Structure formats: C-alpha cells, structure tokens
Amino acid sequence: MDLLAELQWRGLVNQTTDEDGLRKLLNEERVTLYCGFDPTADSLHIGHLATILTMRRFQQAGHRPIALVGGATGLIGDPSGKKSERTLNAKETVEAWSARIKEQLGRFLDFEADGNPAKIKNNYDWIGPLDVITFLRDVGKHFSVNYMMAKESVQSRIETGISFTEFSYMMLQAYDFLRLYETEGCRLQIGGSDQWGNITAGLELIRKTKGEARAFGLTIPLVTKADGTKFGKTESGTIWLDKEKTSPYEFYQFWINTDDRDVIRYLKYFTFLSKEEIEALEQELREAPEKRAAQKTLAEEVTKLVHGEEALRQAIRISEALFSGDIANLTAAEIEQGFKDVPSFVHEGGDVPLVELLVSAGISPSKRQAREDIQNGAIYVNGERLQDVGAILTAEHRLEGRFTVIRRGKKKYYLIRYA
C-alpha cells in the first residue's frame, strides 16, 4: 500500500485538504513537509508522539521532513484547544525550552539520510526580525477578520475572550508555511487535529501570494482512551519524553497498562510493526487476553524508540524485580528509578531495630502496630518477608550501601535512604 493508504490504515489521518492531489504528489515526487512544535514546557510529551512518528514515517517513505521549533510562536501562544488565555513565558525561558525540544526531536529523525535528510528550524529566525509594518502589509493584508473569526480556535473563545496576541497566532503560523514554501519548497504541513484552522490559514496565504500553488495539509486525530480519561496523563502527572521528568520505567509502565480496548490502535499509531504483525497480536489478544502480549510488545517498542535498548532493558528488569520481589539484584540507578515516586525516609545513623524504623519512617503508625505487622507477615525488607519483631537492620540490609526497600502488605512500598 502507498504511504497515505498506510497512514489511513493506521488511523493517522483525520483530515486532508485534497486527498487525491496529496496521494498523487506523494506517489510521484519527493515531498518536503513540516510540523511545528511550540516550546510550552521544557520537554515534549507523549501527546506529541503520534505527530513526531508520522514525520518519521514520511522520511522512511523517502520524503524530507522539517521539524519547526516555535521559538517565536511560543512567545505568543496558540489558542487552539485552549479555553482560556495562555500565560506568556519569558523570552529566555522559551529559548531554553526551544533548545531542549530541538534535542528531543533530533532522536526521531535522520539528519544524515542520503537524499532526504531531515532538518530542524526555529521560526524565531524569520519572525524575530520581522517589523510590525512589514508583517501587517505582507501578511495581515491577506486575512479578513471575518475569515479569522470563523475559525474554531477563535469561535470557541468568543464568550470567554481572546487577546489580539492570540488572535494573531494563526497569521504567524500561516507565515511559517509561506516562508518554508518559499525557502525549502515545503508543500505539506502536518499537525494535530486542533491545527486544522492554522494549517488552512497557511494554505490560504500561499494561494493569495503565489497564485494556484500546490500545497497541502494533513491532520492527525487526537489520541483518545476508551475509558474517557485524557491520554498521556496518569495520577502522577504528564508522561514526558525527557527521562529526567518521566523515568524509562514509568514510561514503560504507562504503555504496559494500556486498556485492551486501546492497545491495537496504539500499536498502529506508535510502532513501526507491520500490518501482519499487528493483526497477529490482535488475534492473540482475542484468544488469550490474559497474556497481555500486545501490551508487552507496545511497551517494549515505544520505550525502545524513545529511550533506547539499554533503558528498555532496565525498565523490564525493574518491572520483573517488583513483580517477583527480587529487589536485591537491582542496581542503585534502577532502585532510584523504580522507587522514584514512593514515600522515602532518610535514616541517620547505623544499625536500627526494624520496629523503630517502621514507626519513624511512617510505615506503621505505632510500635504496637509495627510489631503486629511484622508478626502477621506484612513486612518485606528488600523483597524478603521478615517476621522477627526483634530484627535489627544492619549494613547487610543496605542495597548498594545506600537503600533499603520496605514493603508493607501487597503493594505499599517505602524507600529508606541512608545519610
């Protein structure tokens, strides 16, 4: 199947401006395309992943992707999908975030590809020096207020109010498309479904300034979850692509906990497995859902894509250790990663009675309860059940000399650190 047909099979096409024309172009020519990423935080998150990987699919099919970091548009704020005005971030902050995002995007695209190397650009390079008179004459002149008011991103904010700053955002994004069309021969812009209005504004600007130009837009659907909760969020917050903000273990766990109703769709969106491989996993899901083979494959493929083979191996080791209780064989780095979000307590001093530590660390509310917990077999130290109320924790109980992992009951973990 051709590229557009594959994207449609994967469910990655929400809207296109001219499907037949785009298919013909993609089948006949090497197309330069772009997608923009505004730096609204110091990292991209998994909500960006479907779009990033779609760019990679285009490159693998022989086309040339440009990742555009919104160093300028990030200073303005996109109203699309937002119910209220964004807080304006400082220029220095946006610059720092832009650099981080540029580095992250670089992991997914091939900048050395023979014939179609990817590029990364920053729209501050051309919007920053643009003076207001030139902008109003060369760009603003081509947009009627009526046209802009009809856009969903503006319509949805009429009641609550929208500043002129955010109102003008679509013109800046339209100018990006025109600029890349002129300087890079860029014929296609892709983006999330909320970007349809901004993309079509760019096509309109190209049409008005260049005549009947052949440029196209394609949007990718919003990733949803069958249970109605927001994709990419957990109880502990957003799932980021930066391993310092979301550890590879947490990242792996997010995917392995995917609902049966979502997992095949996510395999199509987020992996490069073939149609045959995904259909085989779909059949296995129907026949033996308890094996969770589709979820394991999804977690492994996406973690490897984002964090690499070694991080995937660590994530699997941590997961298996927590499941089996074999915590003693984890490295210090793996313990830090696997227990990053559990309650922790710093013990200052040497050997300590287990009962005393359980109370001081807040694991058991009183010494009486601590003794009961131990006698009832509810306390595990480094994966081993301890039922001796007189037990003393010594240097032997310190993993890598730095940690003791205590579990109370089936799932309540605590990390003891030593000063």
Curated annotation (Swiss-Prot):
Compartments (UniProt record): Cytoplasm
The listed outcome for G325A is: 5-fold increase in charging of tRNA(Tyr) with tyrosine
Query: Changing D78A: what effect?
Result: Does not affect the initial binding of tRNA(Tyr) and the stability of the transition state for the second step of the reaction
Impact reported for Y169A: Does not affect the initial binding of tRNA(Tyr) and the stability of the transition state for the second step of the reaction
Q: What does the UniProt entry list as the effect of changing S324A?
A: 2-fold increase in charging of tRNA(Tyr) with tyrosine
The observed outcome of changing T224A is: Is not toxic in itself. Enhances the toxicity
Sequence motif: 'KMSKS' region, positions = 230-234
Listed binding positions for L-tyrosine are Y34, Y169, Q173, D176
Under SMART domains, the record lists:
S4
Give the record's GO biological process terms. Answer: regulation of protein complex stability; tyrosyl-tRNA aminoacylation
Q: What keywords appear on the UniProt entry?
A: Aminoacyl-tRNA synthetase, ATP-binding, Cytoplasm, Ligase, Nucleotide-binding, Protein biosynthesis, RNA-binding, tRNA-binding
InterPro entries cross-referenced by the UniProt entry: aa-tRNA-synth_I_CS, aa-tRNA-synth_Ic, Rossmann-like_a/b/a_fold, S4_RNA-bd, S4_RNA-bd_sf, SYY-like_C, Tyr-tRNA-ligase, Tyr-tRNA-ligase_bac-type
Where it mainly occurs, coarsely classed, is cytoplasm
Q: List the disulfide bonds.
A: none
Binding residues for ATP, per the UniProt record? K233
Motif 'HIGH' region, per the record, lies over 39-48
Query: According to the lineage, what is the superkingdom?
Result: Bacteria
Per the UniProt entry, the Enzyme Commission number(s) are 6.1.1.1
Q: Name one GO cellular component term.
A: protein-containing complex
- UniProt-recorded name of the protein: Tyrosine--tRNA ligase
Top-down, what is the taxonomic lineage of the species of origin? Bacteria, Bacillati, Bacillota, Bacilli, Bacillales
